[in-house]
Curated annotation (Swiss-Prot):
Designated name of the protein: Small ribosomal subunit protein uS15
Gene transcribed to yield this protein: rpsO
Organism: Sulfurihydrogenibium sp. (strain YO3AOP1)
Keywords for the protein's UniProt record, in alphabetical order: Ribonucleoprotein, Ribosomal protein, RNA-binding, rRNA-binding
Family under the similarity heading: Belongs to the universal ribosomal protein uS15 family.
Function: One of the primary rRNA binding proteins, it binds directly to 16S rRNA where it helps nucleate assembly of the platform of the 30S subunit by binding and bridging several RNA helices of the 16S rRNA. Forms an intersubunit bridge (bridge B4) with the 23S rRNA of the 50S subunit in the ribosome.
Amino acid sequence: MSITAEKKQELIKKFALHENDTGSPEVQIAVLTERIRNLTEHIKANKKDLHSRRGLIGMVNKRRKLLNYLKRESEERYRKIIEALNIRETSNESK
């Protein structure tokens, strides 16, 4: 369900803006996306796990807010991250 420390470090290294970057929107979005994908697989196998489903909804909302922020601040960085992570652009993100 959760991601390994190695996978998290790999994502941080790939999306970091500089060497010690762990908190930029790109890194946070990448880590959240990996957690969302893992939790989605868990929920597919455990349909009655409502507590995990609620956590998933919270993660998706947090990622959407970060994507909205990134789109407001830098359209280029926003486009790059959604293409790299293969995330759909929804109409809610433009509001």
